[in-house]
């Protein structure tokens, strides 16, 4: 369960970073 949550968090983090880079 913890591993699954960590993977989801990492995926969300990458998506957020991609959006921020797109705005910049």
Swiss-Prot record:
It is found in: Secreted. GO terms for biological process: defense response to bacterium; innate immune response. GO terms for cellular component: extracellular region. Keywords: Amidation, Antibiotic, Antimicrobial, Secreted. It holds the Pfam family Antimicrobial_9. It comes from the Eukaryota. Expressed by the venom gland. Its main location: secreted. The keyword Nucleotide-binding does not apply. Has a broad spectrum of activity against both Gram-positive and Gram-negative bacteria. Is inactive against yeast, erythrocytes, and insects. InterPro entries: Antimicrobial_9. The modification Leucine amide is found at residue 24. Belongs to the ponericin-L family. It comes from Neoponera goeldii (Ponerine ant). This is U1-poneritoxin-Ng2a.
């Amino acid at each position: 369960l913890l591993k699954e949550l960590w993977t989801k968090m990492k995926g969300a983090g990458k998506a957020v970073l991609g959006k921020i880079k797109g705005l910049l």
